[in-house]
Amino acid sequence: VEFKPKKNNENNILFDFQDVKNHPFGNNIKLFISSIDKYFKFLKNHDIHIKSQNNFPHSSGIASSASSMSCLSSCLVDIESLNTKSKEDSYYMKKKSFIARLGSGSASRSIQGPITLWGSSNSYLGSSDLYAINISDDVNKVFHDYQNSILIIDPGVKKISSSIGHKLMNENPFSNTRFDLARN
């Protein structure tokens, strides 16, 4: 992420993905940044150029948005911290996770780890719907070195976006029951 003082009053956000200038995913990034500018005073006075690389296929359903939103959120909070009075690391970790969640719920869990929990739970003191917390110390050590293997059969774009899927879930008459089950 590069940023420099604005030359005009326009909201200048450039996004390159895999060295492709103004990649279509840039529209999602611009909407995201517009939705979070109230949390970052410096965004109103700066132009931003984001150059992104990702080894996950875009919009395929395997967390490419989580990795991008967690990385972008971390960069923005790190930039903000350059010009703010020193705060504890836990403040910045919570803010990174909070901002990442606004871009992708899964992104909130990608900030710290290795094992995190996002969502308020009676089982974990300090858990929150607003940001993820590290629960690595509470999990059996056998899970501390687990790894995933992902076989990509079709790198194409999935038919239903996560945003549409989430909207369908929120409008589902069984959603409150599902959310309650997830919390307990």
Task: Cite the ranges covered by each PLM segment.
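Structured loops at beta-to-helix junctions and adjacent beta-edge loops in soluble globular domains
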Residues: 4-6, 121, 151-154
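C-terminal nucleotide
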Residues: 10, 137-184
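Generic secondary-structure signature for well-ordered alpha-helical cores
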Residues: 34, 38, 77, 81, ...
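Short acidic, glycine/serine/threonine-rich loops at helix termini
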Residues: 62-64, 112-113, 121-122, 161-165
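Alpha/beta catalytic cores of group-transfer enzymes, especially the acyltransferase/condensing modules
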Residues: 91-144
